[in-house]
C-alpha cells in the first residue's frame, strides 16, 4: 500500500499539493503515478484535497489536521483502512509529482529486506547540495543512513574534486517493512535533532533504528517552494496529462 500524506497548509508553499502541473493537481499526479506500482491512497487533512481526489477518482481518506509529521498521517490512514499488521507501507510525499514509477517499485522491493525502514537517494552535485531544501544523507558501508541534514554533508574539506563527489540528495519516499514498524516509529518521542532540522526521519536514527538507503537514478524534483515548481515546470515541459 502506498500512502500519500497531503497537508494543505504547508509552511513554505501553502496549497502546493493542489497546484496544477500540466493539467493535473500535484497530489493527483503523485497518486496516478504511484498507482502504477501498487494500490494508492491519499491521506488528506482538508476537504478541498478530498474533493480534488474524488473528482479525479483517487482513493482518499480524511485524517486529522493536527499531526506533526507525514508519518503520523500515514499511520492514521493505515488504521482507517484497516491494513494488516504485516503489510508493507510506502509513504510517498505529496510534493514528489515527478518521481519515476521505477524508483517507487525499486523501493517497494527494497523494503522487503529492510529490517526497519528504507528510503531513496540520488547522486547530486555540490551546487545542488548547497540548497537547504534538498536534504542530504550520508551512509555507512552497508548503505544504512548515518545522518540526514539540510546542511552540506559531508563537508568537502581538501577533497580531490577530480574524484566523484560523494554527495547524496534524499528523495521524499519511505518504505516500512510492515504496519507494526510504522506504529513503532510514531510511538517514539520526537527528538531534538528532528526538531532542529525539521526532518522526521532523524527520529529513527536517534533511536538507533536502521534506514536502508537505495541509491537510484532519478530526474525527480521535490517541490518545496514556488521557485521549485517554476524550475520543475521548465525541466519537465513535455509531460502528458496523465503519467
From Swiss-Prot:
Its EC number is 2.7.7.38. GO terms for molecular function: 3-deoxy-manno-octulosonate cytidylyltransferase activity. It comes from the Bacteria. One of its GO terms (biological process) is lipopolysaccharide biosynthetic process. Keywords: Cytoplasm, Lipopolysaccharide biosynthesis, Nucleotidyltransferase, Transferase. InterPro entries: Cytidylyl_trans, KdsB, Nucleotide-diphossugar_trans. HAMAP family: KdsB. Activates KDO (a required 8-carbon sugar) for incorporation into bacterial lipopolysaccharide in Gram-negative bacteria. PANTHER family: 3-DEOXY-MANNO-OCTULOSONATE CYTIDYLYLTRANSFERASE, 3-DEOXY-MANNO-OCTULOSONATE CYTIDYLYLTRANSFERASE, MITOCHONDRIAL. This is 3-deoxy-manno-octulosonate cytidylyltransferase.
